[in-house]
């Protein structure tokens, strides 16, 4: 019974982590294209490296939280960083939680308009209502959503990738360091990790961290590889589109495009609820308001910022928060290694 409980808790934690990372930027194929495919033949090595980094970070974060009994993001930063660096990172990351939620809101609006042919604001309203319901029911609801949707995400991406075949185009290397690109990609995608995992059930088993890490690293590298290969199999025209994975899926037939739509919507929802939870906890801690008031504030701000297009969030806003992600990632790994 104890073993079964440990496995379930670890699996839930891994699903929450994966659901948090696999947002609209990942599911659209835009992140995979910009951070990996544009490096030509080196993209596979970069994808493997990113998987290893996800493994290390998720293992370290989980282990640090378990060993120190950490319950909040602020406590986590005090442990791994401390001082002014922790304060700076916490405030920048707190803003990032809000921005990520706004980006997922914009992505839902874009999906409503581009995929379903309905009003942009209908999509925005729908995602806000669903997120509000889940967030009000706490971390348990987020875990349930993640453990249902993440396996479906992986299956959907796999099904599309299998149909795509093995023939791919060659991309001219744009130059630069694929290792640095992978590092930046992982750093900003894991900013929310500590805030969300700190709210999950702690597990005393010493293998919790490494199993969580293996599941997260393997899933992210596998899905990234499948998305990248699918895009390359569809030709150079698809590579240059705003949502390359959607364009590649559409070329495979209506059934596979519908599978992509399901993948995209699931990725938007899982990331939105994780970042929404983190944003609300940050607001409660800093301005001392109730969860309900913090949720209302989040929804109002999301409506105000929804006029920014999703593509602008990914290309112009995300990179601004990279420094907080890099600081957190480096200090997390440094602390983890030092304590071992």
What label would you give each PLM region?
Residues 38-44, 67-97, 114-120, 245-261, ...:
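Transmembrane-helix boundary/entry motifs in multi-pass membrane transporters
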Residues 9-11, 35-62, 211-225, 317-326:
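Extracellular loop-to-transmembrane helix junctions
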Residues 21-22, 46-47, 79-90, 149-165, ...:
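Small-residue-rich segments of transmembrane alpha-helices in multi-pass membrane proteins
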Residues 81, 108-112, 118-164, 314-332:
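Membrane-interface loop-to-helix entry segments
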